[in-house]
């Protein structure tokens, strides 16, 4: 028998994943801002307007949220973290491909995109560790 939405078991991992994704975006913006000052360059050198970066971050965030939701209860975070790094990096490149090829090359070599991807992998590991620790404490109490 099929259960209704109100009868289904709650999935706190999805909500935790959403909060972690929002936190990831905030940290990426902060770190990229510091990197821009340190490197004395803009995160996006090309004149693409404001929509590329917003669209790329939304898509990368959705990718990260889905990965976090799916990997937060896995046995270990390694493949989830590797997947997050790769898929967030690729999402920036694929969205850049909608604009033009020079932007793809620029983003592929960008320390800002690499930072976002590495921080996505770190977010997967941190979420996995946090949920695992919470479940371990609940099972003991």
What does each model-found stretch correspond to?
Residues 29-33, 60-65, 89, 93, ...:
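Transmembrane alpha-helical segments of multi-pass membrane transport proteins and ion-pumping complexes
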Residues 16-32:
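Alpha-helical transmembrane segments
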Residues 15, 23, 116-120:
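Generic hydrophobic-segment detector
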Residues 3-17, 41-42, 61-84, 104, ...:
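Cytoplasmic membrane-interface segments at the C-terminal ends of transmembrane helices
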Residues 19-23, 78-94:
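Transmembrane alpha-helical segments of multi-pass membrane proteins
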Residues 28-57, 92-119:
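Membrane interfacial helix motifs at helix-loop boundaries and amphipathic/re-entrant anchors
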